[in-house]
């Protein structure tokens, strides 16, 4: 019976929905809170050892499981910068993902490091309550309007009839992305150079019109293609910089150190602050614990990650981003090679969850104890992912999707093949098509 109140609901409403689901399906009894997985190890046929750290009493325990699903999410491990002297700061400081609920920002001198999605939400939310807000920008960000609105009556009726998921799926599968009604686009248009260039011109003009100071407007205008990096879907971001208490710092060398009273810049400038908010993103690399499969092979080994490359996924090899060979009964939700930067992740999770549940149930009925992908199926999917990135706009700048561009390869850097760069519809067609009649060509059961 839950119906969202508007198009973009708040964190509180999303949390309420999660609570509703937990109570509706009576699964709270099965949830272990303040328990951190520190290692997964395949120990025997049909058996995984799960090492768990209790964060309350700092003790370690272990359980054994037949199937393991990693649903921790790729954007769940906050990445803090490594500025010298961070421990010296006398004021309050925290990452946006670990927001200090006790922090009182009213009337304070606040600095925020970063201009990504989290930063933009914070900037527009707190500008009116702080004494001053200094935004430390490394890279400008494209933004489009979301024009939030209450859930319309026809959608409410669709919810009541149980058809809203189908409506969402239709919009997503058709490749329509309508958050800004004044700028609709399709998946194909996004990668058309002429179309993209025209959109950049349009959005640049919007920034000029929104920002009173021409110099600030210039600094807030990106120099890379639309959607090459994650785009902000937010209202009032640029106009917030017209407020007298909001200041933009765009030092090319960025922050170099933290001292007792604030941030030191490469230019030598010192910005005195009472609160520092780090909106510095997430470590979107490997699952944040060791996963060891057959014969001691680790997930890091499978994905080409090592200490030399800061354990980034250089060349993940999976089937649909869900299965990894030599890792029987191991499944990843929203894993590498399963989504692109405009994927509707909610729908992806729904379909992957259904796939895993159906697979495990069918194995039980068929008296099968293990499943893993065939090596040839993994190679085939990885090859498809490699080809899928050709011609895509995401290759034209350095971003967390690709971990480097084609040009970087000449300097010895390998761009990541960590995503399925075709449409979400095409991914689901592969997943559902493989699940409905081609399993013997893709999966090995025992």
Residue map of PLM features:
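Short beta-strand to alpha-helix junction loop
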Residues: 2-20, 32, 113, 191-199, ...
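Feature captures the FAD/FMN-dependent oxidoreductase FAD-binding
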Residues: 4-76
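Helical element adjacent to the flavin cofactor pocket in flavoenzyme catalytic cores
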Residues: 12-31, 54, 230-262
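A conserved short coil-to-beta-strand element within the FAD-binding core of flavoproteins
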Residues: 33-49, 102, 244-266
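Rossmann-like dinucleotide-binding core of oxidoreductases
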Residues: 59, 68-202, 271, 325, ...
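Glycine-rich beta-alpha-beta "Rossmann" dinucleotide-binding loop(s) and their flanking helix/strand
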Residues: 68, 72-97, 128, 243, ...
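Glycine/threonine-rich phosphate-binding loop and adjacent beta-strand/alpha-helix elements that clamp
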Residues: 275, 279-363
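C-terminal active-site-capping segments
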Residues: 342, 346-446
